[in-house]
Amino acid sequence: MSASSPNLHKRFEPYAAGGVVALGLALLATPAIADLKLCNTTSSRIGVAIGYQDPTGWTTEGWWNVAAQTCETLYKGALSSRFYYIHAIDYDRGGEWAGKSVMCTADKSFTIRGVQDCIRRGYKGTGFFEVDTQEAKDWTIRLTDPSEGGAKPK
């Protein structure tokens, strides 16, 4: 080998470094996956409804049917609110995960704008529990069995 061989290697280092920088920038440009997910850690099938506030007001949506030991995405994309509200029903053993925040639901699949006057508008007034995402851009909720503080009998 000649004495100039090490210089040949050094001439290509900037190109290799540029490739690494370009790859890094491409990875940074890839959108991050950010969603609100719910995992059913119980042995039952459950039905789930969600409530949230966006710039146009309050919305409730349902029902997601979530099999035992699986997860579902309830809200796709970066979370726009700090607080989300959940109501879930245990289809197999009865009981529900509920709370004090009353929002509108329906028996069949629904998207309802607004949370006022549910019954007068032909919907049910249903108790939802609050989930504080602490302003994270994605969050996973885990519903557990009653023995672990999960669904309460109706």
Name each model-derived stretch.
Residues 3-19:
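Bacterial N-terminal signal peptides that target proteins for export
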Residues 19-20, 58:
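Short, functionally important structural connectors and interaction interfaces within domains
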Residues 23-31:
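C-terminal segment of classical bacterial N-terminal signal peptides
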Residues 30-39, 43-77, 88-154:
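Intrinsically disordered, low-complexity segments enriched in small/polar residues
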Residues 80-86:
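Short, Lys/Arg- and Gly-enriched loop/turn segments at beta-strand edges
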